[in-house]
A protein has these predicted regions:
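Conserved positions in beta-strands of structured domains
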Residues: 102-105
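Mixed-charge, low-complexity intrinsically disordered regions
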Residues: 1-97, 109-223
Length: 223
């Protein structure tokens, strides 16, 4: 079977650094699904307005030339323990496919280059190919009693985020709120913990410079 993208994702993240590790972690992060020309037909979205969430099947396109292995080291385990690639959500997979649940914010049927699907809470970088879109169905897709393997035992680390007023003024209120949440999740690689190092993250067309000391992340400047 050969498959082609049906859409591409438009996101504030030009690179994968800083992209949330899972969908739904930054619930106010806005993104847009832009269908490819041959699928820009409003009929293909008929009835979508009756759903709140969508499943996106997409490609880890930044990893096209990366090697894969039957075992991986999940960041949540500190890179010290191996698990099977199919028992993980590692982006380094044989077929490079990702699966994300996103909330529908707005559907623009008559937009330029539309129809467009605006969504919240995605974990995709800008330009990510999307291969399928399906509605999220509560009775079939929700399993609150399910075990989550090693993830259950390793809570996410949340940081306090300090953003100077001069930096905050360069973003809209929505962009700033999402940026704070993204940074609070600590976008650094888990093995890096140098309080003197300044990291850079492309977000909404600007290079956000920050450093982390203890549990406090401070934005240094925006270029």
């Amino acid at each position: 079977m050969q498959i082609e993208p049906i859409a591409y994702f438009r996101s504030p993240f030009a690179t994968k650094f800083g992209v949330p590790k899972q969908s739904g972690l930054v619930e106010n992060l806005m993104g847009t699904i832009e269908l490819v020309p041959q699928h820009r037909n409003a009929d293909a979205l008929r009835g979508m307005e009756d759903f709140d969430y969508l499943w996106l099947i997409w490609e880890f396109s930044a990893n096209r030339h990366a090697a894969t292995s039957p075992v991986v080291r999940p960041p949540l385990l500190g890179g010290n323990r191996k698990v099977g690639v199919f028992a993980s959500r590692s982006p380094f997979r044989p077929n490079r496919l990702g699966l994300s649940s996103v909330r529908i914010s707005e559907i623009e049927l008559d937009a330029t280059r539309g129809p467009l699907i605006h969504v919240l809470g995605a974990d995709l970088m800008d330009g990510t190919p999307i291969y399928d879109i399906k509605p999220y169905v509560v009775y079939a897709d929700s399993h609150p009693e399910a075990r989550s393997g090693f993830v259950d035992k390793n809570a996410l680390r949340w940081l306090e985020v300090v953003v100077p007023d001069a930096v905050a003024a360069r973003y809209s209120s929505d962009e700033l709120a999402a940026l704070r949440k993204v940074l609070s999740l600590d976008p650094r690689p888990h093995y890096q913990d140098n309080p003197e190092k300044v990291y850079g993250m492309m977000y909404a067309g600007k290079d956000v410079k920050f450093r982390v000391e203890g549990d406090v992340l401070t934005v240094v400047e925006v270029e």
